[in-house]
Amino acid sequence: MEERGRETQMPVARYGGPFIMVRLFGQDGEANIQEERLYELLSDPRSALGLDPGPLIAENLLLVALRGTNNDPRPQRQERARELALVGILLGNGEQGEHLGTESALEASGNNYVYAYGPDWMARPSTWSAEIQQFLRLLGATYVLRVEMGRQFGFEVHRSRPSFRQFQAINHLVLFDNALRKYDSGQVAAGFQRALLVAGPETADTRPDLRKLNEWVFGGRAAGGRQLADELKIVSALRDTYSGHLVLQPTETLDTWKVLSRDTRTAHSLEHGFIHAAGTIQANCPQLFMRRQHPGLFPFVNAIASSLGWYYQTATGPGADARAAARRQQAFQTRAAAECHAKSGVPVVAGFYRTINATLKGGEGLQPTMFNGELGAIKHQALDTVRYDYGHYLIMLGPFQPWSGLTAPPCPYAESSWAQAAVQTALELFSALYPAPCISGYARPPGPSAVIEHLGSLVPKGGLLLFLSHLPDDVKDGLGEMGPARATGPGMQQFVSSYFLNPACSNVFITVRQRGEKINGRTVLQALGRACDMAGCQHYVLGSTVPLGGLNFVNDLASPVSTAEMMDDFSPFFTVEFPPIQEEGASSPVPLDVDESMDISPSYELPWLSLESCLTSILSHPTVGSKEHLVRHTDRVSGGRVAQQPGVGPLDLPLADYAFVAHSQVWTRPGGAPPLPYRTWDRMTEKLLVSAKPGGENVKVSGTVITLGEQGYKVSLDLREGTRLAMAEALLNAACAPILDPEDVLLTLHLHLDPRRADNSAVMEAMTAASDYARGLGVKLTFGSASCPETGSSASNFMTVVASVSAPGEFSGPLITPVLQKTGSLLIAVRCGDGKIQGGSLFEQLFSDVATTPRAPEALSLKNLFRAVQQLVKSGIVLSGHDISDGGLVTCLVEMALAGQRGVTITMPVASDYLPEMFAEHPGLVFEVEERSVGEVLQTLRSMNMYPAVLGRVGEQGPDQMFEVQHGPETVLRQSLRLLLGTWSSFASEQYECLRPDRINRSMHVSDYGYNEALAVSPLTGKNLSPRRLVTEPDPRCQVAVLCAPGTRGHESLLAAFTNAGCLCRRVFFREVRDNTFLDKYVGLAIGGVHGARDSALAGRATVALINRFPALRDAILKFLNRPDTFSVALGELGVQVLAGLGAVGSTDNPPAPGVEVNVQRSPLILAPNASGMFESRWLNISIPATTSSVMLRGLRGCVLPCWVQGSCLGLQFTNLGMPYVLQNAHQIACHFHSNGTDAWRFAMNYPRNPTEQGNIAGLCSRDGRHLALLCDPSLCTDFWQWEHIPPAFGHPTGCSPWTLMFQAAHLWSLRHGRPSE
C-alpha cells in the first residue's frame, strides 16, 4: 500500500490563512541512534566523509502552528498563548521546570553547523501529530492548527563545512532517504497541510490479482462459481464470506463484564460464547490490519490475543552499507508493528521471523510481508444480525486517517492504536446498550482497500445515498474551501473521489437498521452515538442504503440534512459508480526465472564441514536466532488471560512452542460448588489468608491453545509439500500443549502467492492435498485467507502458507515448555523422517548451491506421534518438550538447553553420519523424561510404529554448564551455554544496533536479565508463598470502580483481580459520571489499562487534563480521594500519571478539594522514557520496603517478588529533586526495581532491570497509605499460571500468587476502616 498514498490527482489545499509558527526546543535532549551513527561517520578521520567536528549537541524541536497573527485583539492573543502553554504542559512542562523552551542549545554561526529536520509539513500530519491534535480537540483547543516533533543537532566545524557527499550521508542516515524533511527557516511561510488527507489512485480495479486469487480459493467467476474452500473444508462452516470460512469453537466460560455501572449487582458472569481464529498475510501490511478485518467477520468480536510473523529478503548487498541499510529497514518496520500492537491492549502471544536470500527460489521479488493472526471471543447473542435492505444507515467508525507510507522507516505515519482501541470499545458498548439484532452489513474486502471498495463490499444490491455535510471534517472542510469555479458537480466529485473514496484508511464500516422500538430508552443511532461518546470514538452517519446503484452524493453543505431526514427522497448532486470487475480470460502464469528442476542429491561436501561452524551459522541466522528484540518489546500479557506467552525459563527466552489464552481468569470453586457467602470476609484476616493449608485439588484453567506453522522457503520450492510441512509444524508445536481432545484441533491455512507465477490448478492441487492431509491427521481444517503481492510490484516467486492451530485446552498443573527441568533426566527424540538433510532446510540454504525437493511425512505417522505425545503429557511423564523444525535436531537441543539453563550431553552412534542427523529438519519432537520412565515411554511409542532414540542426559543448571555432542569416543562439539546464548542472540543484537542507543548496547549490564530466583519473604507470609483462594459472592459493601479512560483497553485484569478478592467490581467510563456524587457508593477506585496513543507520557497528562475539563468527573474523583474510608490503586504508566496528576501520590500533600481545578502543570512527577527508547515487556523483580505505609501492600512488606512491567516510560522523574528523600522518610515509597538478590539494599540501577535508569522507585503511596500507584502491574500475575517463570522456591504451588494479597488486603481494609453499606 505504499504507492497508494503517493499518487495524487489534485493537490490538497494548504492552509493559507494567517498563522504563527512557534519553535520550542527540548532542554534535556540527547542524540538519537541515527544522529550518533552520522556523527561517528563524520568524526572518523579515516572516513572519506570526515569533518573533524566538535562535540555533538542534539535536542528536540517542537513546531506549533497557531491560527492568527500578532495583530489580533488581546483576548485572542491570550487564548492563543494559553493553548500554546497547554501544548507545552502536555509534553512535560511544569511549574518547577520546562522540558520545552524558547532557548536552543544550538546556535548557528560561522563555525557551527546546525541541522533541523522532522516530518514533512507539506504532507499529511504524522500519527503523533494527529493524536496530540485529537487530545487538543477533546480539551477544547481551537487555535492550534498543527503540532510536529522534530529534531535539531549541530556541531562545531574545524575544517570545511559539509559538502554534497556529507549531505548524502545525512539524507540516508537521518532523513531515511527523504522519509523525513530538512527544516529551513521560513519553509512553511506559504502554508502547510493541516488536513489528514492523502489522495488515492484513480484505478478501476485496484487489486485484480488479489481478487483473482480469492476467486480461485473461495469461489467466483474465475473458479466457475465453485466454492473450492467449501468443498475441501473438514468442518461445517457457519457461513461463507469473501474473506474466508468461519469456524467457531464454543466455550462455556467466557468472561463477561457488565458495561454500565447501573447494571445488576452481579457485575461479572461466565457466559456461553465462541472463540474464532482469523489471520491474513499481506505485503507491506498495515500494522493493525487484522484488528479491522476481524469485525468484518463478526462485528462484535473482542480480540483477546494476536500473533505476528514477518518475511524478509536476507540483508545482502554489494557492501556493508547496503546490508546495514537493509537491516535498518527491517528493524524499523518490525518495531513499528510491534509497538502498534503493544499499545492496542491485545497481547501478542506467538510469531515467527524468516529471511530468504534473494538468490534462492522464493527470495526473488520478496517484498516485506507480514502475517497477522488474531484470536477473538464472541458472545453467543452477538452473532445475531438482520437482513440487509434499503433504508439502513451507513456508519463509519473511527477518525478518518488515510494511509500514507505506513511501513516506510522510521514509520512516522504508522497506524494509530488509539483509533482502533476506541472502535473496539465503541462496538462493545454498542452491543450492551442495544442488545438486539440491528447490524445488516459489515463485510470487508480481503486486503488493504480503498474506501470505495469497502463500501462496495457492504452493498449486496442497490447503492448508497451519501451526504456531503456528513463526510469527515477534513474532507468537508476541503469542499468548503473550493472556489466557485471548482465547486461544481464534476469538481466536487473529483475532490471526493481523490480524498475520500480512493484512499485506503483504517475505518470500520457497517450498516444498521433503525428499529422502531427503543431499548434502554434509546434508538439504534442514539445507542451507537452514546457508545462512541463513552469510548471517545469518532463516528460518522454517512447516509443510507437505496435501490439506486452506485454512490449517490447529496450536496447539503449549505443546509445539512439530519439523520432522521436521510430516509427522504433526494436528487443526487453527483454519482460515483462502483469499480467494475474486469472479466479476464484464462492466461498462463509468467514463466519462472529460475530452473524448475529439483536435484535430489545434496551438493555440499560434508567432510569439509564441522558441527561447530555449521551450528554457529545456523544459530545466528535470523530464522532461528533469538527474537527477543520483538518479543520483549511488545505487549505479551495485557488483560491477564495469557497463561503461556513466547518467553520461557529463568531467562525469559522466546522459545515457547505454543501459547495458551484462558477464557476466564475469575475464580470458581472446585467441582462447580457455589461461592461462599460474602460475609465470610468478616472473619478473615491477612494472616488467615496465608496460613490456611492449600486445598488438595489443583485449579483447572480452561482456554485456547494457539500455535503457528510456516515453511515459507519450502512452500516456494513445492507448494503442495511445503503446505503439508507447515501443517505438520503447527500440529507438532501443539504436541506438548494441554489440549482436551486431539480431534478438536482446528488447522486454519492462510495462503500467500503471486497469481502471475502460479495458476488455478496449482492452487487447487495444494488445497486438495492439504485437505487430504488433514483427514489423515484426524484434525479439522479450514481456509482462512488468500493474499498476494501488491499491485504494481514485480512478479515474485515467493509463496508461503501459514498454518495456525487453535484448540480447546485445559490445565491444572505446570505447562510443558522447552525448559529442561531435572538433572539426570533423559532426552528422547522421535522424528518422521529418514535422517537425511531435508529439502529446503536451513542447512541446505546455507551450505548448498542446489535446492532439493522437500518431502512431508506420512499423515498417519505424524498423527500417531502427536497423539502418543499427548497421551504421555496427560500421564505426567513428560517434563519438557520442543519441536524439531528450522535448524534441525541440534538446534532443538540447544534451545532446550538454553531455555532451562542446563548442560546437556548428547551421544550419537558411531555408525551414524552425525552431521545430517543433527541438521535434518524432518518434523519431530524432543522431550525430557525421568530415567525411571524411559522404558514405559519407549514401549508406548514403539507400539504405535514409531522409533524413538534416547539422545543423551540433562546436566546441572548454570550459564557455564556445557553442551556436548559425542560421536562415539570423539567429542565433536563442546561449548558453554553462555557462548551458545551469545551466538543464538547475535541476530537480535544486530537488530538492537538499529533500535537502541549505543550506550545501552555497549553497557556491561545489558544482558543482566532474568534469574529472578532469589526471593525475600515478609514476616507475614513466611515460607507459605501461596495464599488461599477464597471464592465468595461479590461483597456489595466493597464496591470498586475501574475507571476507563477514552482510548484505553486491557482493564480485564484489574476487574478480575478485585473480583477474585471478593469485591463487587464495575467499569466506569468518563462520560458516565454526570455529578460529583457518582462515586459515593464506591470504596475503591482502580485506574489502569493500556492507552493507544503512541506517546505514553503525553496520554497520561492529557487524561488528567481531560478529567479536569469535566467538572462533574473531576469533583467526583477528588471527593472520592479525600474521603477517609476509600482506597485507590493505579497500575501501569497511565494509572501512575493520573493518580499523581490528581495529587494523590508523589508528594506529602493531600489531593485538592472538590471544586478546585487540577493543575496538570503542578504534577509532582512525570514519567521518564525507557533507556532503550523502546516499549518494554519485562518480567522484573520488585521489592516492597518493610516500612511502606501502603495498606494494600501491608502483607507483602519486605518481599522481593517478580512482576510484569510493560510500557514505554517506566521511570519516575520528580519535578522536585529532593522529593524522593522526603517520600522515603515519610514511608511513601511503595516499591523499587530490584536486582536478582534478596538484600533489601540491592536495588536495580541499570537497564534492563531498571528500564529507565532514572532512580529505582517503581511505586508510590499517599501519606496515609490509602492511595497506591505502581509502574508494575500485579493484576497481571495474581495467579501462578500468569507468571513467566515460577522460581524453585515456590515448588509446585496450587494456590494463588502472593500478589493476590494486595487486592485481598484492600477488601479487608475497607471492611475495617470504611463505612461499607449495602
Swiss-Prot record:
Report the locations given in the UniProt record. Virion tegument; Host nucleus
* Single GO term (MF): phosphoribosylformylglycinamidine synthase activity
Give GO terms for biological process: intracellular transport of virus; purine nucleotide biosynthetic process
Q: Where are the transmembrane segments?
A: none
Record's keyword annotation contains ATP-binding: no
Among the Pfam families in the record, one is: GATase_5
Q: Which UniProt keywords apply?
A: Host nucleus, Host-virus interaction, Late protein, Virion, Virion tegument
One GO cellular component term of this record is: host cell nucleus
Major subcellular site? virion
Alphabetized InterPro entries for the sequence: Class_I_gatase-like, Herpes_virus_tegument, PurM-like_C_dom, PurM-like_C_sf, PurM-like_N_sf, Tegument_herpes_virus_N
Q: Which family does it belong to?
A: Belongs to the herpesviridae MTP family.
Q: What does this protein do?
A: Tegument protein that plays a role in the inhibition of host intrinsic defenses to promote viral early gene activation. Interacts with host DAXX and thereby disrupts the complex between DAXX and ATRX. Suppresses the DAXX-ATRX dependent deposition of histone H3.3 on viral chromatin allowing viral transcription. Targets also host SMC5/6 for proteasomal degradation in a CUL7 and calpain-dependent manner to support nuclear membrane-less replication compartment formation and lytic virus replication.
How it assembles, according to the record, is: Interacts with host DAXX; this interaction disrupts the chromatin remodeling complex ATRX:DAXX and thus allows viral transcription. Interacts with host SMC6; this interaction targets SMC5-SMC6 complex for proteasomal degradation.
**NCBIfam families this protein is in?**
tegu_FGAM_synt
Q: What is this protein called?
A: Major tegument protein
Name the species this protein comes from: Epstein-Barr virus (strain B95-8)
Q: Taxonomic classification, please?
A: Viruses, Duplodnaviria, Heunggongvirae, Peploviricota, Herviviricetes
